[in-house]
Amino acid sequence: MAAANAPIIMKEVLTLPSVGIGQQFITFTNVTMESDKYICVRETAPQNSVVIIDMNMPMQPLRRPITADSALMNPNSRILALKAQVPGTTQDHLQIFNIEAKAKLKSHQMPEQVAFWKWITPKMLGLVTQTSVYHWSIEGDSEPVKMFDRTANLANNQIINYKCSPNEKWLVLIGIAPGSPERPQLVKGNMQLFSVDQQRSQALEAHAASFAQFKVPGNENPSILISFASKSFNAGQITSKLHVIELGAQPGKPSFTKKQADLFFPPDFADDFPVAMQVSHKFNLIYVITKLGLLFVYDLETASAIYRNRISPDPIFLTSEASSVGGFYAINRRGQVLLATVNEATIIPFISGQLNNLELAVNLAKRGNLPGAENLVVQRFQELFAQTKYKEAAELAAESPQGILRTPDTVAKFQSVPVQAGQTPPLLQYFGTLLTRGKLNSYESLELSRLVVNQNKKNLLENWLAEDKLECSEELGDLVKTVDNDLALKIYIKARATPKVVAAFAERREFDKILIYSKQVGYTPDYMFLLQTILRTDPQGAVNFALMMSQMEGGCPVDYNTITDLFLQRNLIREATAFLLDVLKPNLPEHAFLQTKVLEINLVTFPNVADAILANGMFSHYDRPRVAQLCEKAGLYIQSLKHYSELPDIKRVIVNTHAIEPQALVEFFGTLSSEWAMECMKDLLLVNLRGNLQIIVQACKEYCEQLGVDACIKLFEQFKSYEGLYFFLGSYLSMSEDPEIHFKYIEAAAKTGQIKEVERVTRESNFYDAEKTKNFLMEAKLPDARPLINVCDRFGFVPDLTHYLYTNNMLRYIEGYVQKVNPGNAPLVVGQLLDDECPEDFIKGLILSVRSLLPVEPLVAECEKRNRLRLLTQFLEHLVSEGSQDVHVHNALGKIIIDSNNNPEHFLTTNPYYDSKVVGKYCEKRDPTLAVVAYRRGQCDEELINVTNKNSLFKLQARYVVERMDGDLWEKVLTEENEYRRQLIDQVVSTALPESKSPEQVSAAVKAFMTADLPHELIELLEKIVLQNSAFSGNFNLQNLLILTAIKADPSRVMDYINRLDNFDGPAVGEVAVDAQLYEEAFAIFKKFNLNVQAVNVLLDNVRSIERAVEFAFRVEEDAVWSQVAKAQLREGLVSDAIESFIRADDTTQFLEVIRASEDTNVYDDLVRYLLMVRQKVKEPKVDSELIYAYAKIERLGEIEEFILMPNVANLQHVGDRLYDEALYEAAKIIYAFISNWAKLAVTLVKLQQFQGAVDAARKANSAKTWKEVCFACVDAEEFRLAQICGLNIIIQVDDLEEVSEYYQNRGCFNELISLMESGLGLERAHMGIFTELGVLYARYRYEKLMEHIKLFSTRLNIPKLIRACDEQQHWQELTYLYIQYDEFDNAATTVMNHSPEAWEHMQFKDIVAKVANVELYYKAVHFYLQEHPDIINDLLNVLALRLDHTRVVDIMRKAGHLRLIKPYMVAVQSNNVSAVNEALNEIYAEEEDYDRLRESIDLHDSFDQIGLAQKIEKHELVEMRRVAAYIYKKAGRWKQSIALSKKDNMYKDCMETASQSGDHDLAEQLLVYFIEQGKKECFATCLFVCYDLIRPDVALELAWINNMIDFAFPYLLQFIREYSGKVDELIKDKLEAQKEVKAKEQEEKDVMSQQNMYAQLLPLALPAPPMPGMGGGGYGPPPQMGGMPGMSGMPPMPPYGMPPMGGY
């Protein structure tokens, strides 16, 4: 059966590799397909990612970098579910993402691993763990809900599917497990069926299952079915079954009968098993898909087998339902995505014909609405009708596929049945059946509605229409209109009977719906007529209708201006305005005229409306000058100002401030330029300064930045309006920092009497010019002095203020200023009053009135400056008596006491409140000792030092410095820059320190001397303290300091100090002495304190006398001392002495250095003694290893053997390697043998020339490197037998083979190498390299064995390598064979042709050349055969026939002159109709005079130079050849040449046939004349019939009559008359039919017109509007011009549109 006729169509939708999916990822665990929408692939290389393939756009996959163990796309939407194992646990983390929203919907961490999961519904995931099954909804925040536990039969099964029934009441889980031991290849299938309602499970054997819904006849509710397929092995028999069972049968309802069927597997598929099952809900078919690609198709209702075929050569591992087409998708291992669908054109014929199952064919055709069962259905219908089974017939007609019985004939059949009394009419039964099944067609709907309307059951119609059971049509609407207009309108709308719908809406006056409906259906009604109709009754409705028209897509169907005219013709100004305002909202330039119009009509009739329009700023393209004039006339001055663009116009209008809103006028100023604005302001001030001042001030405030503040100020100043200036600057002041502005504001406020404002600004402003303001206020002499006080107080003009007030006798303001305003400035006031010679009583009273608020310091300064300090005595004493602790009070009082010499020392020592610096400074010139007292009391270091230096009071200075104990002070007085340093040091050493009893003071002084780097002075100081029996003689720190200072400053005294002092830090001082290179002193210190190690180190490291150190060590006999000596000896290279010393010291710590030194000096005997001593205390691998090495160096091999047998920690491997490296092979041999290091032992034995032992050791080592070393050594020693033993163990390693081969070859051992390789062929681990290398060796050294070797082992050779070897050695036959084996046919062919004596063999070459890829080699092969083997060239050409360019081959042979040689080849390829081949063969046939073959060639192959061939053979001596030439001319359309050539040879039949085929009347008639001239009457008669269509009857009759051949022309005439009369009859018949059609059409048009006239009253005629004033009549013509009429001159033209006349301009 051809694939085109198969009932199932298979199509490859795509291949996964074609969209970039790697073959390794096309597996069950990596690929998922949950529906026919998406395929999801999980990749793990080159990086973890998930690929989502949308089946609508498969070549645009979405790849996202995601790491997961599994990924599932939602069946319906772009939602992705991901599963990944939590690292280090057996838990799985689940996540659900919305890819489009890029948001995570839900996540959950499962406590156990999910073995399988699947989308069971678009909102639900099924999760299968090792023990249980869970459901997880993607909606809400719910966690997975456990549904049931897995049954035992699914333990250790691989879960392959999980599904739920459509009502989610039944669940099925499917798994597979290894087959039984008797049949392990057949995989077991297990199924668990679970009922959600009953909470019970049932275990069954099945490989695949699926749920379905099926309506059982007699049951309106669908039944839930499960179908499952199984294949099991029991008792040696394989059973394959398909089961279909109903789940949860409905009580009291018909149930589905259980069905089962066999699955027939072919013998080659005995171990195949079902892996998937899909149920087509569209056709109710079951698809069973097996692993090896078999497809079984069964009917769901009957379980009848329909089809079986193999749909995939590769195993199928995944399927998914393709619900839209009633098929399924399948994915196989190769990555093909296959789509299986029902072949709707062939499946019914297949079932009825091939399967002979007529009932199934009919049922499936009805169920799936499929073609192919028409005859069966019609026949069955007729049978039922004949049997009066009307109900069954009605059901069959209702279910008939593709509605073949849903015709008027069927309705007529039921109508024709007579109705029995008391029974339902069959027609109603038929319609009832149709209504239960679905929707009626238009004819059925009309017929049923007639019945219902006649019975007045309108409600039935409404119900059916609501349920969409009827197909609406215009005829149905016309029928229903007779009973219900509303219902008819609904039907018209559904039937898209647009004219009827528009008429109905117009009848209902629902004009807005007309527009909506017309837009929806694309209908264009008469909008003008509709608008006029609405205007008559509903002006506002007309506005709404016009606006709806304006919003239509594609623009308003009626011009806006026309619509406006319609409104204005009826004086509907408000409606016209409303319409225009709405449609002109876009404010487009093309609407300028309409914008002007709407403004004009409203400015004349409703100015307030026009004002609102203009205020909203809706329009910007109207005639602004025209509107400006109209606004001015209407009194809308602000609008006219906005529209005028000339300054005179603006100035004329703007003075009407009485009618202009002030705020609007202010805003208008903002639209003018600064120059025009100033001009207008001047006019306003000129007209009415007082009345317009507020507006001007407001405008200046608002636009001061644009106008310029200076310009505004000048404007007010020009009109001397200080009031305006005051109000203007008052608002601007807070924003300005201009001093001039602030000053002018102060000036304006002062001149307008705003004293409080002057006071406020002078107090708060920071920007006015203080000097200028002060002068202005002094000149103004305001009655209130507070503004002046503010200025002078803030800007430091207090003396000027005081002088002004004192001279103007404003003493009250002086007191007020000092007491209330700023008491802090009282000193300045007092100073100025003193300067103004004010009475002291007033001043004292002023001071006392302020008292504690008065700042004392500046007051004292002011009085002290003027030598009037005593003036303050009473004031100061008064403050002290009040308990004042103010330093300035006490300073002033002290100065007065010092000046009066009233016991100043008592005051200086007892008063705690004065400032020592101030008072001390005051005393310096009066009494320096008093200054020292004051400075000492205040610790004024710098001042005290300065005054004592200046007055040579060094003893006081020394005592003060010692007592202060201040480091900074000491540093200052001991610095070199101090010229009095020596005098101070002398006083400190002689007086201050000896007097001191404080250790802290001494310590501070010593530290200061050290810091100042005065060592000699410090020694002098310390000797005075330490050596002269003072209180500090035994002080530990001072003794250390004395010695250390001496070390630094005077080393000659150090030894004396060491001998005289005992209480110092010996170790520390000794180290310092060493650092100072006082080695003997250091040695003496260390000896004195018994620090022997430090002492010997001084001798060794500093004095560098090993002899003294050895002598010292013998004297003290301490191990530590000997250890130091040994180390020094070791450093100096006295290794033996050092070893002796280390032994005396019993010191093992330096064994590494001793070993190193011993090896350097080769003193291994001493080293052995030392290491034996060390071993007793230390267990170190290094020690034992070095001991063995030392034994080896002194050749004590016996001790080595004894030592390694004893317990030790030596690193024997390392020792052995070291001995081997230093060629101590015998010792190394002992070590390697002991530690069983056979590899090293082998190479050691090689060094010792012990080859047999080396081979034995190498065998034990079994290391490639060892084998190589031993092998190469044996080869060098010509021990080839042993070398071969080694070599066989080497060449099995691919990497080492070439090295062995080169080693043998470099030494000329070719035969031995070949013998080794030949032996290697038989090895179990023999690899390609051995076979290849042996082939290379044969090619080089034993050519005769090469071919045999290649043929025997061609599959085990590295052919490219051997190809190179054969090419180098020029073995062409073998090279060709190798090229063939390697599929390099181009190179093989080239080699054969280039080296044909050795390499060519015909059969082999044919096989080669048929497979070459380079096209040029074909033609090279043709040349090669032409030159060397021409006898068999056709054999070669036939092999290459499908690949050759035949034209090129012919050219090659033609140039070579051997064209005939390839005639058989050309005959074979002539079917390709190649011009060169055709011409070559025709040429050969012509030369051979083979006219039959030539004619056959011309007929069958037309690609050649026809005229050239004809010209070549038209003069041939053979007639048949000339006939061929004529035949060629005929085929080429050269009719005359062909006929002339045939005439020449008397070939009259050919002439007639040529003339007939030419279609040329003249040519045929000329031939008739020729036959008449030749007297060929029979030819004349024959020619009339042959050329019947070309010869005109009058010409034939004329020629026959003239030439007396009427008898011969008569047959022709009879035939012509018969044909002519038949044509006339046909024409008459056609004309009669056309007349009938015209009459029928006219009658139909009349019927349509009468039908339309029924609704004429609904659409009144468009009557003209009544005449309006100024218009001649109705219609749409322009109004006549009135200006030129008699008696009307001087009148302005009347306004159009019925508007009242406008005023003149």
UniProtKB/Swiss-Prot annotation:
Any one GO molecular-function label of the UniProt entry: clathrin light chain binding
Record region (Flexible linker): 493-536
Region of interest (WD40-like repeat 6), ranges: 271-314
UniProt name for this protein: Clathrin heavy chain 1
Family: Belongs to the clathrin heavy chain family.
Annotated spans, WD40-like repeat 5: 206-270
Annotated spans, Proximal segment: 653-1705
Native source species: Arabidopsis thaliana (Mouse-ear cress)
Annotated CHCR repeat ranges: 551-697, 700-842, 847-986, 993-1138, 1142-1283, 1288-1434, 1437-1580
Region (Distal segment): 537-648
Signal sequence annotation: none
WD40-like repeat 4: region residues: 156-205
Positions of region (Trimerization): 1564-1705
